[in-house]
């Protein structure tokens, strides 16, 4: 387990730096004479036609619907592994991160709704500060090296995975519309095929890939967000083969570098470019960005700490071995790094609204995530031992 976590975090650290570079590059492009080129590139029409099938979208939506489906495939594989064999495989292990994740979603959402009360357009963004960017949060923690106890790393990993699971449910329930019965029927047949492959013990990934592609197209056309196809595919791929090997883990390890070094940086570059030219202090303090920023900076740590404390006091959960509240608190602050996940939800929440709302949401996400990262890093650095701990 130690080796797996070390390998995972070493990639997340490098990936987190690349994400930051992508965001800076996007902001520079959006606020320079190259802004027209930037917007034109993302708005480029890309069409795929095979017989009667016709998918016609701007490049930005191919990134958000296509590349991010692969990212959610990876998230689904991680969730399944942790539920069956990892940090969430028993009630005792899963209790504290589960309560923490629930609090870390409810309180930020409540803060956002408090600032956006009475406005049905902006209220659609309530889930934006509820998300945690697992890659960036773990990347920030990885900068502290072996000073961080393994139990604390596992707590953040488990919490972030449950948070991702919550985001998946939110997308399915609240950000799907104009459902197509025919497309849903085709998607259902594809899902039955995937389940059948699993039940028959098929471990070759090619059949899952073929049915998965059919499922993605059907879900894309159905009105349900296409990224959910990635999660469904992940849950159908067997965790263990008869010989003890793991097709699921093999695919997960193969996808990690693609996710960290291509998918997420490309997504960040495509979605983080906010033009600041027409924004004033009043704009920055308007309900959408202030609700998101405060939800991430204050709501996340308050929610995580409050629900964790209640769960421990009621003996529904216990703190990890050799970890105290002084170490949990800065990790709770790190959970406010919403970044790519928050921007992704923002793209769904304000997809049909004035583009201004999307810009405000991304700006609030960037400000909130940046402050949460700084606070979490320096706070955790302060409370950890100066020398490495035994892992």
From Swiss-Prot:
Q: Which Pfam families match?
A: Na_H_antiport_1
**Catalytic activity annotation:** Na(+)(in) + 2 H(+)(out) = Na(+)(out) + 2 H(+)(in)
KW Methyltransferase (keyword) present: no
Q: Does the keyword Transport apply?
A: yes
What InterPro entries is this protein classified in? Na/H_antiporter_dom_sf, NhaA
| Biological-process GO terms, alphabetical | regulation of pH
Q: According to Swiss-Prot or TrEMBL, what is its membrane topology? A: Multi-pass membrane protein
What keywords were assigned to this record?
A: Antiport, Cell inner membrane, Cell membrane, Ion transport, Membrane, Sodium, Sodium transport, Transmembrane, Transmembrane helix, Transport
Q: Which GO terms describe its molecular function?
A: sodium:proton antiporter activity
Principal location class: membrane
Record's superkingdom? Answer: Bacteria
Q: Which residues cross the membrane?
A: 14-34, 59-79, 95-115, 124-144, 154-174, 177-197, 213-233, 261-281, 290-310, 328-348, 363-383
Q: What does this protein do?
A: Na(+)/H(+) antiporter that extrudes sodium in exchange for external protons.
Q: What is this protein called?
A: Na(+)/H(+) antiporter NhaA
Protein source organism: Shewanella putrefaciens (strain CN-32 / ATCC BAA-453)
């Amino acid at each position: 387990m130690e080796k797996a976590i070390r390998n995972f975090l070493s990639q997340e650290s490098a990936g987190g730096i690349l994400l930051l570079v992508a965001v800076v590059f996007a902001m520079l492009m959006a606020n320079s004479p190259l802004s027209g080129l930037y917007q034109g590139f993302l708005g480029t029409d890309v069409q795929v036609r095979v017989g009667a099938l016709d998918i016609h979208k701007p490049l930005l939506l191919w990134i958000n619907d296509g590349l991010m489906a692969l990212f959610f495939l990876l998230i689904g594989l991680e969730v399944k592994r942790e539920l069956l064999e990892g940090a969430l495989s028993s009630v005792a292990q899963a209790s504290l991160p589960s309560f923490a994740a629930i609090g870390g979603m409810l309180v930020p959402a409540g803060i956002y709704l408090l600032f956006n009360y009475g406005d049905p357009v902006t209220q659609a963004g309530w889930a934006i500060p509820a998300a945690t960017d697992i890659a960036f949060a773990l990347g920030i923690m990885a900068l502290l090296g072996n000073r961080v106890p393994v139990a604390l790393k596992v707590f953040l990993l488990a919490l972030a995975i449950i948070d991702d699971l919550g985001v998946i449910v939110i997308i399915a329930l609240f950000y799907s519309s104009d459902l197509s019965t025919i497309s849903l029927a085709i998607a259902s047949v594809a899902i039955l095929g995937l389940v059948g492959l699993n039940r028959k013990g098929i471990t070759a990934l090619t059949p899952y890939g073929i049915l998965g592609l059919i499922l993605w197209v059907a879900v894309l056309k159905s009105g349900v967000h296409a990224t959910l196809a990635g999660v469904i595919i992940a849950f159908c791929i067997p965790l263990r083969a008869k010989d003890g090997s793991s097709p699921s883990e093999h695919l997960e390890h193969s996808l990690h570098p693609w996710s960290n070094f291509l998918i997420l940086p490309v997504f960040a570059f495509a979605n983080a470019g906010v033009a600041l030219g027409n924004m004033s202090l009043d704009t920055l303090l308007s309900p959408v960005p202030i609700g998101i920023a405060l939800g991430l900076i204050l709501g996340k740590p308050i929610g995580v700490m409050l629900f964790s404390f209640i769960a421990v006091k009621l003996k529904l959960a216990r703190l990890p071995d050799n970890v105290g509240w002084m170490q949990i608190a800065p990790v709770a602050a790190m959970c406010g790094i919403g970044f790519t996940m928050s921007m992704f939800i923002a793209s769904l929440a304000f997809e049909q609204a004035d583009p201004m709302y999307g810009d405000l949401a991304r700006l609030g996400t960037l400000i909130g995530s940046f402050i949460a990262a700084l606070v979490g890093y320096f706070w955790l650095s302060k409370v950890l031992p100066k020398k490495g701990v035994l892992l």
